[in-house]
């Protein structure tokens, strides 16, 4: 058994896919017999400590968090001292075998600091926006100070996991990362949910229903979806936008300007079973992001049998197949996006064919296989750390056999 302290400033119900994925990985590791504690952000009404599905979750206070979906700069900065202080208290009273941080900033700063203070090996999982986001002024590619901080976190970690080859390449090429990086794609925990009819969900029966899901930020390019739909004159469609974030008001205004207000529903943040009920009631999933580190939401949509329309930029291109799982379009190519939407909307047979394919294809991305690779990599890192320290101390014999891990 390994004792793992996982740090992620965003953990459900906070954040987006990166938080959900870290929860699924942590839960799968506990199901394999390991002990996982989670250090994350406290927000309105959430308890400072609780047990969730076998995980002990510790939440630390931050300043300036505005909503569930999106962290402010000040909330991210304040997570570091709060996280280090809470982690210090935990590590003084309990022996952990390994630290695993998700996102280079701010979680990785916390993890690297605790690793140095206590001599415990640190594995950093890099996600996407922490490495590359061309739409944000405050991102490693657009801010030299942040680039320096992220580079230092990368090169101070004992091992890195990238959620896609795309993110690995960007860390090595753009940020000069010298630490070993293994690629471990996200997986999916097949959700259990009771399907509901469109009538129960308040969705018209006689329209082709498109759904976009994610934080409402520029990088998700939901603006392009609205622009594409404005070109589909006379087509009976409805767009459900699930999520919240700083772009919501601008998107609402754009929908009105384009004459789409009556055909676009802003659903707000939807979680758990309800999220999958809306996905299962839709016909097409569309999210042409400027960039995705991986895109867990695409797996969720495919599990519900939806054809997926995405962009050609990011880690999603490592598993989405143009013409097989749906369509891939260049970033910002509104006309091409409108064409692919129309093609799927007008061809029920094609939608059914892709739906059946996706429901089977997504089974390859099982979370248990992801957890097995994390387990093997963690065990290998712990062994290397103990050899370096000349310590084969208590608990070393309990580590899983093996320790090999591919990329």
Regions found by a protein language model. Give the residues of each.
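Conserved donor-binding/catalytic core segment of Leloir-type glycosyltransferases
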Residues: 161, 204-220, 226-229, 240
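Short hydrophobic beta-strand element within catalytic cores of glycosyltransferases
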Residues: 307-310
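Aromatic "clamp/platform" in nucleotide-sugar-dependent glycosyltransferases that forms part
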Residues: 290
């Amino acid at each position: 058994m390994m004792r793992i302290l996982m740090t992620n400033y965003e953990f459900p119900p906070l954040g987006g896919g990166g938080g959900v994925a870290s929860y699924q990985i942590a839960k799968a590791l506990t199901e394999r017999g390991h002990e996982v504690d989670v250090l994350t952000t406290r927000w309105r009404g959430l308890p400072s400590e609780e047990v969730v599905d076998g995980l002990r979750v510790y939440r630390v206070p931050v300043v300036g968090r505005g909503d569930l979906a999106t962290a402010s700069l000040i909330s991210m900065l304040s997570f570091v001292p709060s996280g280090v202080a809470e982690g210090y208290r935990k590590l003084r009273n309990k022996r952990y075998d390994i630290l695993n941080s998700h996102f280079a900033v701010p979680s990785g700063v916390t993890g690297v600091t605790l690793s140095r203070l206590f001599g415990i090996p640190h594995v950093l999982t890099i996600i996407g926006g922490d490495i590359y986001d061309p739409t944000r002024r405050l991102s490693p590619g657009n801010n030299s100070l942040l680039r320096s901080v992220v580079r230092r976190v990368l090169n101070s970690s004992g091992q890195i996991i990238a959620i896609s080859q795309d993110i690995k390449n960007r860390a090595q090429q753009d940020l000069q990362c010298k630490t070993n990086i293994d690629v471990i794609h996200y997986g999916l925990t097949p959700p259990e949910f009771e399907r509901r009819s469109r009538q129960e969900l308040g969705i018209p029966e006689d329209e082709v229903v498109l759904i976009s899901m994610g934080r409402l930020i520029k990088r998700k390019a939901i603006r392009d979806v609205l622009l594409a739909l404005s070109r589909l004159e006379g087509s009976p469609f409805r767009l459900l936008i699930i999520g919240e974030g700083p772009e919501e008001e601008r998107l609402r205004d754009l929908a009105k300007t384009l004459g789409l207000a009556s055909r676009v529903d802003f659903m707000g943040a939807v979680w758990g079973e309800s999220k999958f009920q809306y996905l299962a009631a839709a016909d097409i999933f569309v999210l042409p992001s400027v960039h995705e580190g991986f895109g867990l939401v695409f797996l969720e949509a495919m599990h519900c049998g939806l054809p997926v329309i995405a962009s050609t930029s990011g880690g999603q291109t490592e598993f989405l197949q143009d013409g097989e799982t749906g369509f891939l379009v260049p970033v910002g190519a509104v006309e091409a996006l409108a064409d692919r939407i129309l093609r799927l909307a007008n061809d029920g047979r094609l939608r059914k064919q892709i739906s059946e394919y996706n429901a089977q294809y997504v089974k390859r991305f099982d979370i248990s296989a992801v957890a097995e690779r994390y387990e093997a990599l963690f065990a290998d890192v712990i062994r290397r750390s103990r050899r370096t320290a000349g310590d084969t101390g208590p608990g070393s014999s309990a580590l899983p056999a093996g320790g090999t891990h591919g990329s």
